[in-house]
């Protein structure tokens, strides 16, 4: 019966405890403590009152809890801008004991003073040894040598946490079983060192850490590495286990140039590579190294004029099976649009290599830019075993509905587009039919997706708002 009771949602478990003495005993050992506006039934109250009610309810629940049997503590306090730190200290002392498996703390960005997470709760080996997932957001965290051994911790997420290089080093040195590490906007970190003792680490994600200058990776089994930020020095002692690599930079940073010169040394065994360039000029160095085992390549570029450089990426990937290109149609220059000339006559675009394993190609944000049209023709002429090619004229993530404009099961929406972007998309459809369709070999599935008529049927203030497909 206790197990069945533990499966009840928080509010249902609380109601049951009000009508039964037996359930009241179970309530005092309730294992899954998830506190947020939704689970506490505060959504119908005025949003400005959420913080007051949430603090009061959570405090009463935890004061009446025995502290035993808690497996998960999830505190979402985004609406609590003025919470007294003593409340948090007390709640953590009650719930974080032996047997705790998951701790998640989300604080408001608008607090005048950041909360300092008490490392002392993990100085006790009983609590430290049982924790499996730790997620902290918008707080101060200062681990020291007194930290207990987190021998079962396999997932660690730090969002906007004020933690130093030294503090993170102490934390990682006690986390031998760590498998996933996510670091987001931790701006006190300058040099991130992933020690070799993290034998089980498989996924490492680093995002927007503004002061980060160096990343040194010594984890011997790292298979997935995602990085989003300024392009810095990154070294991987043994890159052979890496299979999935994602690189993005939010600022103009010559991402593709960086990929040409820096990435081949760490991506020789990578199967999936994603590159997101916020801005790039056309003067990108040729890629002379190889990605011998790369199967999937996905690239985001803003300026379609830079598409010429991508040929070297295709030529450097002899085993490539799938290629996805995202282009921002807002950056089409009027003087670069395909005119009446033959779009395939430029000798620069004549195939130098055959891409014998490339079977699927998708271009999202396809437009009438001359270089992009020639790039598509290059792919058609150099890919003898191509199965399908899709030219999607919508922006961002592409078309979210099927080709008939019907709703998907998830009822996802196409991205909004300006009137100018929609006009360019329709022009791109005509260009594709005139210059590309006739060159597609028989047996290759060829699709040109224009903007969804339902998503972009109405305009307001020159913007096409999200519509339901």
Positions of the model-derived regions?
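A structural signal for leucine-rich repeat
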Residues: 89, 93-94, 116-128, 146-153, ...
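Leucine-rich repeat domain C-terminal region
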Residues: 234-253, 354-356, 365, 382-389
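Eukaryotic tandem repeat interaction scaffolds
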Residues: 268-299, 318
């Amino acid at each position: 019966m206790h197990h069945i009771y533990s499966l009840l949602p928080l509010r249902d478990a609380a109601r049951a405890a009000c009508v039964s003495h037996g359930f009241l005993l179970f309530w005092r050992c309730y294992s899954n403590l998830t506190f947020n506006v939704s689970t506490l039934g505060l959504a119908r109250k005025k949003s400005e009152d959420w913080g007051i009610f949430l603090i009061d309810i959570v405090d009463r629940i935890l004061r009446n809890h025995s502290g035993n049997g808690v497996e998960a503590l999830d505190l979402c306090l985004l609406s609590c801008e003025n919470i007294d730190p003593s409340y948090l200290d007390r709640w953590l002392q009650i719930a974080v004991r032996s047997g705790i498996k998951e701790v998640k703390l989300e604080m408001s960005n608008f607090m005048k003073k950041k909360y300092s997470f008490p490392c002392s709760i993990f100085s006790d080996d009983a609590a430290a040894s049982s924790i499996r997932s730790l997620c902290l957001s918008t707080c101060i965290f200062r681990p020291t040598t007194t930290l207990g051994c987190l021998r079962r911790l396999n997932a660690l997420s730090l969002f906007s946490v004020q933690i130093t290089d030294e503090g993170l080093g102490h934390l990682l040195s006690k986390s031998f079983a760590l498998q996933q590490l996510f670091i987001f906007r931790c701006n006190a970190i300058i040099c991130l060192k992933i020690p070799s003792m993290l034998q089980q680490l498989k996924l490492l994600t680093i995002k927007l850490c503004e002061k980060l200058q160096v990343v040194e990776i010594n984890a011997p089994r790292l298979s997935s590495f995602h990085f989003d930020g300024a392009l810095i020095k990154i070294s991987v002692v043994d890159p052979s286990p890496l299979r999935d690599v994602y690189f993005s930079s939010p600022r103009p940073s010559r991402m593709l140039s960086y990929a040409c010169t820096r990435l081949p040394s760490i991506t020789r065994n990578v199967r999936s590579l994603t590159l997101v360039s916020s801005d790039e000029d056309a003067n990108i160095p040729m890629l002379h190294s190889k990605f011998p085992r790369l199967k999937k390549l996905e690239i985001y570029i803003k300026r379609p004029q830079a598409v010429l450089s991508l040929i070297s990426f295709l030529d450097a990937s002899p085993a490539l099976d799938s290629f996805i290109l995202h282009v921002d149609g807002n950056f089409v220059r009027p003087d670069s649009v395909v005119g009446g000339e033959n779009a395939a006559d430029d000798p620069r675009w004549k195939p130098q290599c055959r891409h014998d394993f490339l079977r699927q190609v998708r271009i999202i944000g396809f437009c009438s830019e001359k270089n992009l049209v020639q790039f598509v023709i290059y792919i058609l002429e150099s890919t003898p075993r191509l199965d399908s090619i899709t030219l999607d004229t919508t922006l961002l993530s592409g078309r979210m509905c099927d080709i008939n404009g019907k709703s998907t099961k998830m009822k996802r929406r196409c991205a909004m587009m300006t009137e100018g972007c929609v006009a360019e998309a329709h022009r791109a459809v005509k260009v594709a039919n005139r210059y590309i369709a006739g060159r597609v070999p028989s047996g290759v599935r060829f699709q040109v997706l224009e903007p969804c008529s339902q998503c972009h049927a109405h305009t307001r203030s020159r913007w096409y708002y999200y519509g339901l497909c």
